[in-house]
Swiss-Prot record:
E.C. number: 1.1.1.2, 1.1.1.372, 1.1.1.54, 1.1.1.19
Subunit structure: Monomer.
Keywords (A to Z) from UniProt: Acetylation, Cell membrane, Cytoplasm, Lipid metabolism, Membrane, NADP, Oxidoreductase, Phosphoprotein
Protein name listed in UniProt: Aldo-keto reductase family 1 member A1
Catalytic function, reaction form: a primary alcohol + NADP(+) = an aldehyde + NADPH + H(+); L-gulonate + NADP(+) = aldehydo-D-glucuronate + NADPH + H(+); L-gulono-1,4-lactone + NADP(+) = D-glucurono-3,6-lactone + NADPH + H(+); allyl alcohol + NADP(+) = acrolein + NADPH + H(+)
Length: 325
């Protein structure tokens, strides 16, 4: 039986399986949170840009707190600072909006969602006439210093990064008085992220995998892309262990001590996704899954510019995915 959480350098325990809420529609996410809490989840991953924190807050208000089903101190809640709120003056108001929406007094973890800043304001995707994004020059190191104030004020217990590469992580560490505790990135057997995970672990950061099942429900999905849940190695292990393909993918991660936040609104899949602590893979089975790595990235935000689909931010100097890791 594997431990079901990792210890952050802050002393907090972070559950290895959490419920992801990206692409969970309002009208569905409240029920999903309640199903997850009753299935034993104690980790919820949110973000202001997902547009559903108000409804998540309704579920938390009904289920979490003194005299409710789940004591607040048993729940680990993550949210993320969006790109339009990187200016130091905008950081605390953005967090306070998230806290108000989630109906919480503090967050367990607050992540910078991306390394680059968009133009300030309340439109999450400010665009030029040709469809390209309008950026802001605020550097993530300035944003980080503003995030540190939130810890001092007791509004956030730990800070972290999302979609940063190894060089950018070290850049943040060079100015940090509050060290990042977690890096959240896309990660699954097709994008194993071994170098990046080793880099993080050597510096005291834990790693959370988003889209651990391969994210086949994205709007910009390519018809020819590989489908992770149909990978023959995964299907063979699922049959051998009497498990679902999703459980195979999640077990591989938790056995590597990588946190996962699979998104689901389906009660039976929500339950299935946390039932990964009562079986283990042999070293040979882990090697079979490790061998699937092809550095295949599903999550590259796309936009339409002059009628063509192009990566949204690939030309930005702080775009994280041009480096090897």
């Amino acid at each position: 039986m594997t431990a079901s959480s990792v210890l952050l350098h802050t002393g907090q325990k972070m559950p290895l399986i959490g419920l992801g809420t990206w692409k969970s529609e309002p009208g569905q996410v409240k029920a999903a949170i309640k199903h997850a809490l009753s299935a034993g989840y104690r980790h919820i991953d949110c973000a202001s840009v997902y547009g559903n924190e108000t409804e998540i807050g309704e579920a938390l208000k009904e289920s979490v707190g003194s005299g409710k089903a789940v004591p607040r101190e048993e729940l680990f809640v993550t949210s993320k600072l969006w790109n339009t709120k990187h200016h130091p003056e905008d950081v605390e108001p953005a967090l306070r909006k998230t806290l108000a929406d989630l109906q919480l007094e503090y967050l367990d973890l607050y992540l910078m969602h991306w390394p680059y800043a968009f133009e300030r304001g309340d439109n999450p995707f400010p665009k030029n006439a040709d469809g390209t994004v309008r950026y802001d020059s605020t550097h993530y190191k300035e944003t980080w210093k503003a995030l540190e104030v939130l810890v001092a004020k007791g509004l956030v217990k730990a800070l972290g990064l999302s979609n940063f590469n190894s060089r950018q992580i070290d850049d943040v560490l060079s100015v940090a008085s509050v060290r990042p505790a977690v890096l959240q990135v896309e990660c699954h057997p097709y994008l194993a992220q071994n170098e990046l995970i080793a880099h993080c672990h050597a510096r005291g950061l834990e790693v959370t995998a988003y889209s651990p099942l391969g994210s086949s429900d994205r709007a910009w999905r390519h018809p020819d892309e590989p489908v992770l849940l149909e990978e023959p190695v995964v299907l063979a292990l699922a049959e051998k262990h009497g498990r679902s393909p999703a459980q195979i993918l999640l077990r591989w991660q938790v056995q590597r001590k990588v946190i996962c936040i699979p998104k689901s609104i389906n009660p039976s899949r929500i339950l299935q996704n946390i039932q990964v602590f009562d079986f283990t893979f042999s070293p040979e089975e882990m090697k079979q899954l490790d061998a699937l790595n092809k550095n295949w990235r599903y999550i590259v935000p796309m936009i339409t510019v002059d009628g063509k689909r192009v990566p949204r931010d690939a030309g930005h100097p702080l775009y994280p995915f041009n480096d090897p890791y």
